[in-house]
Amino acid sequence: MQTNDKKVLITGGGSGIGLILAKTFLNAGSKVIICGRNLEKLEIVKQELSKIEIAQCDVTSDEQIKALLEQCKEDFNGIDILINNAGIFNIFDYQNGKLSIEQQVKEIDINLSGALKMVHYFLPLLLEPKEAAIVNVSSGLAFVPLTAAPVYCATKAAIHSWTRSIRWQLKGTRIKVFELMPPLVDTSMVQELKGIPKMQLDELATKFMMDFKHDKFEITPGPAGQLKMLSKWAPGFIFKQLNKNI
């Protein structure tokens, strides 16, 4: 997949994986638009990266997604690459009841339904360029769940299954469908998890871009590849190893 002169839209682009991908695509010659719920956070990024474009959008809102779609049409004459990265990560135990059902449903709405909505509304626009791509960010935890984050892992497993399906459905089009499956990455989202190794953002971005340019549709940086393999060959062992300190 080429990156030069491509127009890239990244959800959840104000921090973490979304932001490092934005920087990576900028360095690769792409025009980058990041969106997120927190406009103040996006404006801070804009101050640092003047070439980046920002747009406020909550991916759980159909109306805000439609408005973002119109903005991409009018201001950028479409997009070439959609990266569904927006997500939240909640650690909780059902026995203590500290996370409300509303918070659990919100995690599903952002992590899973948000990506579905973005593809639903943006697909016609992505069918226009000669070459386009959808990148869904799931997780190595799609293969082996971390029991401390049950809803997060369930949403990422669903993203993995859904991505395989839409890749198959779109194989006769000009849209390439990628899935980035990171291991735990050193971001503020998972700072509550102690004692578990985390991948550095720049290392993740380097691996992603190398595989993206070579059309490797399932990208498993670092330990994520091991999780995927061991989930097939030794599922009980790797599940216990991952969760032994939880």
Description of each model-found segment:
Residues 119, 155:
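Active-site helix of classical SDR
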Residues 179, 187, 191-232:
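C-terminal helical subdomain
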Residues 57-67:
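The beta1-alpha1 cofactor-binding region of Rossmann-like NAD(H)/NADP(H)-dependent oxidoreductases
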Residues 12-16:
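Conserved glycine-rich cofactor-binding loop
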Residues 139:
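Residue(s) in the substrate-gating loop at a strand-loop-helix junction
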Residues 28-43:
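Conserved glycine-rich Rossmann-like NAD(P)H-binding loop of the short-chain dehydrogenase/reductase
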Residues 66, 89-105, 148:
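Conserved mid-core segment of classical short-chain dehydrogenase/reductases
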